[in-house]
């Protein structure tokens, strides 16, 4: 017998759409299931001003399929030259919903990010005053710190001092990958929340490294050991209001992934909801799927939940997803969850 679950239509609180041909290929995959998404600003060149954000939003809206019901929620890329007045005006106009902090060199297209945090304190102080959230890629870039330890080091040496200096700043610690990150978000005082990705719930570093290197599982923050994956699953499926979905769906062409020095990023927009239903079902927590995908995020960003609904069905045969998508510039590989998915989104 078919099992079904109806939830409010979900949102994605961390999404990379890229631009140009890639955006035209991947945007329909997000718009099919998600009503809204926080759009990452790490283009080349990055989205650093209100004018940049407006132009990017216009390009996204122009690329939407006919009849699509999708709202891009724009962000600005924080640099050491960011103007607090420009940020405040963009927020007041409803153009942006967050500012993104990339430590310089931490991930894809982060070269323009922040090298010295104190240099952006005037912007962060203004954000604290007006209630504008700061989304953080929480990893240090010190080459002496092991890549598997960079999230914990960031929390201990950067985030905790930052929040002590600016206790009123709204912070979203994005794509949490460790039990340390989960424990910090649960236990910290003040206005803190965290996003968790689809792929970090589904895989751990064994999936990436055992039996051969699988470049399409390479992402930043890098997948960790299974014990951290289990901590992420407990947090996501708990219904805790500080955790919500941010897929960090980050497409790269196969040629940029399947190479001697491949790019970091996982494209998961198409099958995310099937993956999440699988995780929550497996962990006996389907009752909390709606909170994670559809309720906690809007509450965090001061928005109402979507009025529309989505129905997921569990069938007795796996759902087949395309392994690859074609773009004008070459093929793109969809995230492989490494297990059959019996849940699907009902049309």
Swiss-Prot record:
The modification N6-carboxylysine is found at residue 100. Pfam families: Amidohydro_1. Binds 2 Zn(2+) ions per subunit. Zn(2+) 2 binds at residues 100, 137, 175. One of its GO terms (biological process) is 'de novo' UMP biosynthetic process. HAMAP family: PyrC_classII (MF_00219). Belongs to the metallo-dependent hydrolases superfamily. DHOase family. Class II DHOase subfamily. This is Dihydroorotase.
């Amino acid at each position: 017998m078919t099992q079904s679950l109806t939830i409010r239509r979900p949102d994605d609180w961390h999404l990379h759409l890229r631009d140009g041909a890639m955006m035209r290929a991947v945007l329909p995959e997000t718009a099919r299931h998600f009503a809204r998404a926080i759009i990452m600003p790490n283009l080349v060149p990055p989205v650093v001003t209100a004018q940049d954000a407006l132009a990017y939003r216009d390009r996204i809206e122009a690329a939407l399929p006919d009849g699509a019901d999708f709202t891009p929620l724009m962000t600005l890329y924080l640099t050491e030259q960011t103007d607090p007045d420009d940020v405040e005006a963009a927020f007041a106009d409803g153009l942006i919903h967050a500012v993104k902090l990339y430590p310089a060199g931490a991930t894809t297209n982060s070269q323009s990010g922040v090298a010295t945090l104190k240099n952006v304190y005037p912007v962060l102080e203004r954000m604290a005053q007006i209630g504008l959230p700061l989304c953080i890629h929480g990893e240090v870039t010190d080459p002496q710190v092991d890549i598997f330890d960079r999230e914990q080091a960031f929390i201990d040496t950067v985030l905790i001092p930052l929040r002590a200096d600016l206790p009123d700043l709204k912070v979203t610690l994005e794509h949490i990958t460790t039990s340390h990150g989960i424990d910090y978000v649960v236990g910290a005082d003040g206005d803190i929340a965290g996003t968790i990705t689809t792929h970090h719930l589904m895989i751990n570093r064994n999936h990436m490294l055992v039996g051969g290197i699988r470049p399409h599982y390479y992402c930043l923050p890098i997948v960790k050991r299974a014990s951290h994956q289990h901590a992420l699953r407990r947090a996501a499926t708990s219904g805790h209001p500080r955790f919500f979905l941010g897929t960090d769906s980050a497409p790269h062409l196969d040629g940029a992934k399947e190479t001697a020095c491949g790019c970091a990023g996982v494209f998961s927009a198409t099958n995310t909801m099937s993956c999440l239903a699988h995780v929550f079902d497996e962990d006996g927590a389907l009752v909390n799927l709606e909170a994670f995908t559809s309720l906690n995020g809007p509450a965090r960003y001061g928005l109402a939940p979507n009025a529309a609904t989505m129905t997921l069905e569990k069938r007795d045969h796996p759902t087949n997803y395309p392994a690859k998508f074609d773009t004008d510039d070459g093929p793109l590989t969809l995230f492989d969850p490494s297990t059959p998915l019996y849940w699907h989104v009902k049309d």
